[in-house]
Amino acid sequence: MIFTILNVLTRAMLVMSMYSLTTWDSTSRNDMCFSNDSPLEGLVYYWETHSKRHDYKKQESQRCRVGDSDKKMITNVTIISLISEIQKSISELSLSCVNDDNSTGQVLTFNGLEDTIRGDYIVDCVTGLYQSDIGVGVGLGRTHHGHQQMKNKAVVIDEKERMISLLETQQSENDIKMQVLMSEIEQLKNQLSKKRNERGQEKRDAEKVMSDLMARNSDLRKHNDILTAEISQMKNKNTIQRNKNTVSTTVVPAILSVALLSSSVAPIIAAPPDSPMINPWPHAKNRVGTGMYKYDENDDSGCRPIRYGVSCIGFDFMLKMDKYPFFNAFIGHKTPLESFADKIIEKEEETCEIGTNKEFKCFEERAYIKGTCPTNINAVHYIDNKGKLRYVKCKENLEMTEDCAFCRKIKKKAGQSVQVQKTSVPLQDAICQENSDTYSGPKIPFKGVCKIGLIKYKECKFKTSSYETVSFITLKEKGKIYIEHLMLKNIEVVTNVSFVCYEHVGQDEQEVEHRALKRVSVNDCKIVDNSKQKICTGDHVFCEKYDCSTSYPDVTCIHAPGSGPLYINLMGSWIKPQCVGYERVLVDREVKQPLLAPEQNCDTCVSECLDEGVHIKSTGFEITSAVACSHGSCISAHQEPSTSVIVPYPGLLASVGGRIGIHLSHTSDSASVHMVVVCPPRDSCAAHNCLLCYHGILNYQCHSTLSAILTSFLLILFIYTVFSVTTNILYVLRLIPKQLKSPVGWLKLFINWLLTALRIKTRNVMRRINQRIGWVDHHDVERPRHREPMRRFKTTLLLTLIMMTGGNACSNTVVANSKQTRCVQEGSNTKCSITATITLRAGVIGAESCFIIKGPMENQQKTISIKTISSETVCREGSSFWTSLYIPSCLSSRRCHLVGDCVGNKCQSWRDDQLSREFSGVKDNHIMNENKCFEQCGAIGCGCFNINPSCLYVHAYLKSARNEAVRVFSCSDWVHRVSFEVKGPDGETELVTLGSPGTKFLNWGTLSLSLDAEGISGTNSISFLESSKGGFALYDEGYNEIPREGFLGEIRCSSESAAISAHKSCIRAPGLIKYKPMTDQIECTASLVDPFAIFLKGSLPQTRNGQTFTSTKDKKTVQAFTNGAIKALLSINLDDHEIVFINKVKNCDATFLNVSGCYSCDYGAHVCVKVKSSESADFFAESEDKTTVLSFPIQSGTHDYCQVLHFQKPLVDERLSYSCGSEPKLIVIKGTLVCMGVYDFRNKTGGSSTVVNPSEGAWSISNWFSGLLDWLGGPMKAILKILGFIAIGIVCFVLFMILIRIAVNSINIKKKN
């Protein structure tokens, strides 16, 4: 069964890669094809068999060649080696052996294709399908069909020897490859060794740095010990001095404040602030207040209270400086849970238990906050919108997941009694304080925000949501308030500062195993509460507030660094909040409507089609530039700002009519607008004629009788004026007499000469007549023999030549010849294979270039037409970047000296990328930011115990003012590209856009374009902008690679998303944000260039240096109008393309409709015909001299078809024979064309689109004159009519001169009177 399935699958295989063996003689031809895996024995066997069958192999040697090499005599013994070369080849290769006259021969070819079909088969040469097995056993030399072994043993021996030599050659090649691979392996080993050495050196350097740090740490510890000893000595001296002096002073504490506080915060100096480690302050677990980190009495005993050396998972997690940076910056303040235990804040009565309480209200606010939890805890807490503590816990023995959203049960480890600790962590990085202020001011706004969590600020139609780290405060009776710009200050006041006290374990003379400290409440000190027994001493702040000199102390008390009151700048006032911190919460931000909206249609604009162009009136905005495009041709107009503009007609639209797309740029604060105008077709004479211009005079067919008389009069007046000026100049130069000064004198002289010549001619004629009739005496005179001149008919030949009509259809047409086409009959159809490379000129815009493929029968043809759609000079973009409008925002925090990061001269060396711990909660926003530190005043007057300068830390960031961006780019070059509509031989249509050089692969062949064109210059001082919403603009500033302040591109991003989000990967000019520190707060400003204002002002189209810039047809880049021209050559390549001609007669009837346009011009004339056909076909018409050709595919039914033709004379009268596959019929194209003139004196300051292959044939006076004669009815009628108009013009001129003279005389008479 399996073998049967395999056999069926094998027969269904389609072989692509194959060998083909062709043998022929004078009587027959045989073709056989084999699969790719066919063995050498099989190929040799069938080569020998076919040779014998066709009686071809009779000589001992043959004339053979491999591939394109020269033919050589090759013996039959060595022919197998050549077949082996074909069998081994991986590319297309052939072996051919033929006789001298090619009457007999044999060819073995490999097509060079690839497939995955395995096996040796005989396949169909056309379809590639399996036919049969090859029938030759590999290496056996026999066939399965009973063929005998090859008789020529010498051939077998030679073949084996050749195979041995081939194997030896292959072995040598493998040895060479092996050597190369071994050398590469050695190089890789050397590189690996080098890398290992480098890593070893880096490791040694790191160990060296680590040893240096450890040594430095050791030095710091020694310095700390020395400093502690000095402080102790100074304490003793101070105690003695106090005993001596009963009057206490504040001078000594002030002097000692620096040293004493250095002792208390020295451990902080040893740990860098950015280190993601546990808070290094040794008294972090000596909490201010009761130190009860609990929600109820069931919480972990290690948290009730927090003590030295006792683990509390929840609080220990908060000491991680990367998780709660704000809390660790204010370690001397209380956590929210401690504040609840100390009655500072209240709790929500309802406790949420995950899995029990399914009401969403319990978790509604929690759902918007994102947090991180450690393992082995069962609860979280947070401050809700009411400013109260809300508690969320899991069921018994379930732990909170890492995202603090779910609960899970973990199996206990062996010997473990409790797996999950009953403690919690906060979802917010916050601290709380006592005695907060109340606030009764207005609602705190949050700019650009719709909603934060459950707090709604405004309704937004368009918004975006994301999790952000937002600062917040809580106030009494106000609840939680989110703050956009957090500005805080931390002051130190003796009357409002917290102390932590401790004693040493073992100082009561009981032995202890480990050295440790023990927490003591400050309220246990006798000097604080007289009912207590503990004798306490402390640092200078503690001793300044309490009397430390009563007796020998038991307990040491120090003030908690940064535990002084924390104030927030709220609406310009400093408020002491109840709690302050950060939370990562879901924020809905408003998405503003884009300022740069896509180009809008101007529906209210008014348009009118006038003789000189399209008149457009705006709805109030002032138009500066306009671009009109139709049928691929564009023209522009530029003017001073005005509410109306007249745009010239592009191309022949003034007479042809149709839709015109118009783009208008204006001075209003919006992008350019677009409108579509439809103009009706008009008579060519009315559209393109003028009276006082030379081409108006030349368009004789457009003149009426009155305009002809007026033209004649003006022509005579012009001649008279020129003649008068010339004769007067000659008279002044004494070159002519006075009698010839006036043109009338010259006219009299001409008439006298004419009459004299006529009289002499008459006299001579009369004399000859008298001599013939004998009225005069005869004299015998020998008559000379005159040779009769040959009649050349000069006049007739001239008139014949000038009356010939010139015309080109399809712009350029090439007909395939017999060498390019090979046809065979297949049933009722004809199958033709064409291989050709044709080069022809591209047509002007709207015209077509055609390649006509004719079949073997009359009127069989296929056409490849290439219609030129448009031509553009487009920008080749250079460097680019994205940018937007950015505004700065600042956060600030002032810390006293030796508090937090304000240590030593650290503020002076603060780096822009160094973030203070107060703002570490916002470090994950990934936006452009910088950090500053400004030294401010110190000492008690500025709320500090230390007289050294305090530190004002600033975290500034930039954010995009709008949710959009613009791309700025330069044009390194301007290149030409042309769009074509290509119709294949089977009627398939495809739109192709090509540059030079460019090639398009089509299903019938390839189309290539080569251009001869000049680029444009003068654009280096211009930059271009592209909106993310669509549209382009121009800016009169050169593109600079480096961002500079005060220029476009002060901030540059690599992508649109990076620009909108103000990502930190964007580069920016230095010093963009300006700072003004004011003791407790900062004012930051930035004056950045607004790219959106630039875009609106320079929205395309714009005109610079006589060139108009606008967007391309596909709206992907910028193009320029330059009034230029290009020469375009098309190359069509067909390689064995098959075309089927259906041997069926197709009838059609065609009627000429009209012809309109111009002659001897670039635009050509539109010839339109109406064709009726019962089915789809190819219409073909040509004149007898084949100079005028029409060719296009037609559809069934009756339709109108138009093509652009080029004529060289104004009167068109062409007789064409047309056919759609049947007998040819007659069609006559008849009409008149106008002369448009080479120059156009209308305003063209903006330029027009590039002309493709402008007309090389100049205006011809002979063609014009022949058309004039035909139009006037023939030579004789033309001469009489012209003389008549001249006579009428002279009469009008004489009357005009008489009237002038009468008017002058009457004026002179009035002056005399």
Curated annotation (Swiss-Prot):
The record marks 1311 as: Important for glycoprotein C and glycoprotein N subcellular location. Residues 731-773 are annotated as: Golgi retention signal. Residues 18-712, 810-1278 are lumenal. Residues 769-773 are annotated as: Important for correct targeting of the glycoproteins to the Golgi complex but not for heterodimerization. The record marks 271-272, 809-810 as: Cleavage. Residues 896-902, 938-949 are annotated as: Fusion loop. One of its GO terms (cellular component) is virion membrane. Residues 1-17 form the signal peptide. It comes from the Viruses. The keyword Coiled coil applies. It holds the Pfam family Phlebovirus_G1. Residues 178-237 form a coiled coil. The chain crosses the membrane at residues 713-733, 1279-1299. Glycans are attached at residues 76, 102, 496, 1154, 1243. Disulfide bonds join 303-312, 352-362, 373-404, 394-407, 432-579, 450-460, 501-557, 525-536, 543-548, 602-605, 609-679, 629-634, 810-850, 823-832, 875-971, 890-1084, 896-944, 902-951, 907-933, 937-942, 1053-1066, 1148-1220, 1158-1161, 1168-1202. Residues 250-270 are annotated as: Internal signal sequence for glycoprotein N. GO terms for biological process: entry receptor-mediated virion attachment to host cell; fusion of virus membrane with host endosome membrane; symbiont entry into host cell. Residues 793-809 are annotated as: Internal signal sequence for glycoprotein C. Keywords: Coiled coil, Disulfide bond, Fusion of virus membrane with host endosomal membrane, Fusion of virus membrane with host membrane, Glycoprotein, Host endoplasmic reticulum, Host Golgi apparatus, Host membrane, Host-virus interaction, Membrane, Signal, Transmembrane, Transmembrane helix, Viral attachment to host cell, Viral attachment to host entry receptor, Viral penetration into host cytoplasm, Virion, Virus entry into host cell. Belongs to the phlebovirus envelope glycoprotein family. This is Envelopment polyprotein. The lineage of its organism: Viruses, Riboviria, Orthornavirae, Negarnaviricota, Polyploviricotina.
